[in-house]
């Protein structure tokens, strides 16, 4: 991330369940109470995904933003679909990629950059169970090698 960014939420499962092929930064349309709640760190990307709708707009589905307590009855709906701000060419390209078999668009992180809410999204291909096991084995081998090297290089 660049300077001036404040990461609010990460989708840790996305790195494990998917192979991320390409990433993109998108703006996020939020209501006032949602911005205040996100600034307090009360947002979750677990189970969220992005999809292009009939009007040609990309929206994020399933993202949870806790209602802001001070908003009272004028607060927001916690799991509403939120519009992503992207160029039409980007929406078209990513929409076509997501229509391919086994591909989806997943949110990777939610952050503020220069005061604006941004969402890092990735085009991802789902992993099979054996792929996940292989990734775990590789990660464990790397950790073990680093540990052994650090023992010899005090």
From Swiss-Prot:
UniProt KW keywords: Cytoplasm, RNA-binding
A Pfam family recorded for this sequence: SmpB
Coiled-coil annotated residue ranges, if any: none
Cellular location(s): Cytoplasm
Basic and acidic residues bias (residue ranges): 133-154
Ranges for region Disordered: 129-154
InterPro entries named among the record's database cross-references: SmpB, SsrA-bd_prot, SsrA-bd_prot_CS
Main location: cytoplasm
Gene Ontology annotations for the cellular component aspect, listed alphabetically: cytosol
GO biological process: trans-translation
PROSITE patterns in the cross-refs: SSRP
Presence of keyword Transmembrane helix: no
Record-linked NCBIfam families: PRK05422.1 (NF003843), smpB (TIGR00086)
Name by which UniProt lists this protein: SsrA-binding protein
Organism: Salinibacter ruber (strain DSM 13855 / M31)
Lineage: Bacteria, Pseudomonadati, Rhodothermota, Rhodothermia, Rhodothermales
